[in-house]
A protein has these predicted regions:
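Mid-to-C-terminal polyanion-binding domains and interfaces
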Residues: 70-74, 316-322, 326-359, 411-585
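Short helix/loop capping segments that flank catalytic or ligand/cofactor-binding pockets
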Residues: 89-90, 147, 170, 245, ...
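Short, well-ordered strand-loop elements centered on a beta-strand within folded domains, enriched
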Residues: 175-178, 183-186, 391-399, 522-526, ...
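Catalytic domains of riboflavin
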Residues: 1-3
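Conserved beta-strand positions in the Rossmann-like core of class I SAM-dependent methyltransferases
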Residues: 107, 160, 538
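Active-site cavity-forming subdomains of large catalytic enzyme subunits
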Residues: 126-204, 208-217, 227
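Hydrophobic helix-and-loop "lid/oligomerization" segment in the mid-to-C-terminal part
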Residues: 7-135, 155-156, 173-176, 182, ...
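Short, glycine-/Ser/Thr-/acidic-enriched flexible segments
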Residues: 85, 142-144, 166, 191-192, ...
Length: 585
């Protein structure tokens, strides 16, 4: 059962509203997102390129770009080594195009998810050595590649690291000892000594900051680097970074540019998904376009996605984009099968575990993270999904707020051949013989309580469903872009009746309702969740007959509470308010 609670953060909402020309409702919503003080509020509402932080504040950024300038002037061969997800693809694109623009002799390599696994490895290093590569620059990986970078250095190569992942460490007697590779320069805002004001950049944003400095040193107008902002925004949302502070500005500015994008690949991907560039929002990055990019790295090679953005021929770009859309459709089908298998395993034997470890040897290893996310959502427990690979077992984990997944993996790192990640997500490789040992140890170390497993729904503001009007709903758009750490406002109302409920949609998976308030006002509502579960919930609570009456549009005794977001429904030139139900009781 979910636990609903109202966020109560105090402020002079009337004063804020007056100073910024907004409603007290919007002022409260901004405060609920942790934004305090006039300067921070102004930055939240209107922050633009001028408010971005100085890239030179990134530790080693000056040194790394000095090395690049020297290598470019000497025409040394440079290779970008990225990653196979959306952030890795966009990071690689930015570095490759940026270094090329500066006159560098540069190529790129993206690891094969199945053969290479995550990030730089000895195989890729030896390939680079055989190709006469002088300098390797990583993006969205490299911070944990201590041994691999030592190998590259032993072969005489220069190694530059740009990354955003957690810094690896060992722990002795409660004290952390952070590891650092032999790389010639490392740019990662998470380094302890780095004074960069914002630590939550994605890999593509770090790469872009490097290119900004490189352009300046190569006498290229820094404004040219703004062309990459659509890629940075795409990666920031696609890699599920917090949409706070600088990330909020990066995504906002990137969305402006994508609405008029001239990149044939980006336009083709948008059009193949039956959208227009001016329609694109952060939602489309995360749930429509992004999965197409990730599908190439999961089922084929991420080079397909990268080549899409490098493509200058419109017809060819359209063909590649169509291939990516098809791959994503295949991925969806395979994911559904994997989720079903995983839930069976959980229900048959793992329900008592605080941390779920699901071993699915025959499931495609690239789908482990998605499946883990779905199981985490269903069970509200930290979840690892492991699959069989060529060299042992690989897996991905997805966590809940109370559980820092990367820190917990550090407690049993001796079991892994490789691991890394964030508080909310992680990846790991281990011998098959260690799977059960891992299951036991990760649970033995777990300090979660029963309270931690209860999903918590944070309500921004209680508000009657008939209160929001069109001007207020339009004003709420000031809070965009929405995403992690800047979710759509969660508004709640209670004691609502159901005048009518109708199941619609091609797959009969959308519920349209007419709700009635205690004051007799009617409001249109829509619910995109599990319709059968909705019926069963109210059937248990009020009886199946009452539910049947509601679906027939007849008088019934059902009363419901909802968490919702108001939207404008446009139909045949008319506008009306419709609420989108997120949760119900």
């Amino acid at each position: 059962m979910e636990k609903w609670f109202v966020i109560n953060k105090g402020a002079d909402f009337a004063g804020i509203a007056k100073r910024f020309g907004i409603s007290p409702v919007t002022a409260r919503l901004i405060r609920n997102r942790g934004v305090m003080g006039d300067e921070a509020i102004a930055r939240y509402l209107k922050g633009g390129i001028g408010e971005l932080y100085d890239p030179y504040l990134l530790l080693d950024s000056d040194r790394l770009t000095d090395i690049l300038v020297q290598k470019i002037s000497e025409q040394k061969k440079i290779r970008v080594i990225g990653d196979y997800d959306i952030d890795g693809v966009m990071s690689t694109y930015i570095l490759y195009k940026g270094i090329t623009r500066c006159g560098g002799s540069v190529d790129f390599q993206i690891p094969d998810r199945m053969k290479d696994g995550y990030g730089i490895n000895d195989h890729l290093i030896e390939q680079a050595d055989e190709a006469g590569i002088d300098t390797i620059i990583t993006c969205d990986n490299g911070i944990a590649a201590i041994g691999e970078i030592a190998h590259a250095k032993s072969l005489g190569m220069t190694v530059l690291v740009t990354d955003h992942h957690e810094i690896p460490y060992t722990e002795e007697r409660g004290e952390r000892h952070y590891k650092r590779s032999e790389a010639d320069a490392i740019v990662n805002p998470k380094q302890m000594e780095c004074t960069y004001p914002y630590k939550n950049l994605c890999g593509a944003a770090v790469a872009w900051k490097v290119i900004q400095i490189l352009y300046e040193k190569c006498d290229i107008a820094v404004e040219e680097s703004y062309d990459f902002l659509e890629n940075v925004a795409f990666a920031t949302v696609g890699d599920v970074m917090d949409l706070t502070d600088e990330n909020r500005i990066l995504v906002r500015e990137g969305l402006k540019r994508i609405h008029t994008t001239m990149n044939p690949g980006m336009r083709a991907l948008i059009l193949q998904n039956k959208l227009e560039p001016e329609q694109i929002s952060s939602y489309h990055f995360g749930f429509v376009l992004g999965p197409c990019i990730n599908a190439s790295g999961r089922l084929e090679t991420a080079k397909i996605a990268l080549n899409l953005f490098l493509q200058e021929d419109v017809k060819k770009a359209s063909e590649i984009a169509a291939e990516l859309v098809d791959l994503n459709a295949q991925r969806k089908d395979m994911t559904a099968e994997g989720v079903e298998l995983a839930m069976q395993q959980v229900e048959e034997g793992n329900t008592g575990e605080k941390v779920l470890v699901v071993y699915l040897p025959d499931v495609h290893e690239s789908l482990a993270g998605i499946i883990a996310g779905r199981i985490r959502e269903a069970c509200h427990k930290p979840t690892f999904v492991l699959t069989k690979s060529e060299d042992g077992v690989k897996g991905s984990g997805r966590s809940i707020e109370a559980y820092s997944m990367y820190e917990e993996l550090c407690k049993c790192q001796e079991l892994f051949t490789k691991f890394g990640g964030h508080p909310m997500a992680a990846g790991l490789s281990l011998p098959e013989a260690n799977v059960e040992i891992f299951r036991e140890k990760i649970n033995a170390c777990c300090g979660l309580t029963e309270e931690d497993f209860i999903p918590k729904i944070k309500i921004d503001i209680p508000m009657p469903v008939d209160y929001p009007d069109i001007p207020l709903v339009n004003e709420l758009l000031l809070l965009e872009p929405f995403g992690k750490a800047n979710v759509k406002p969660q508004i709640a109302d209670k004691n609502l009746g159901i005048d009518r409920a109708v199941v619609v949609g091609k797959n009969q998976n959308v519920l349209k309702l007419t709700l009635k308030t205690e004051r007799g006002k009617s409001i249109s509502a829509v619910y995109f969740g599990d319709v059968e579960e909705f019926r069963e919930y109210y059937g248990r609570k009020y009886g199946e007959n009452e539910v049947q009456q509601a679906f027939l549009g007849r008088t019934n005794g059902i009363r419901m509470s909802v968490v919702y977001y108001p939207e404008i429904n446009r139909y045949q030139g008319n506008e009306s308010i419709q609420i989108v139900i997120k949760n119900y009781q």
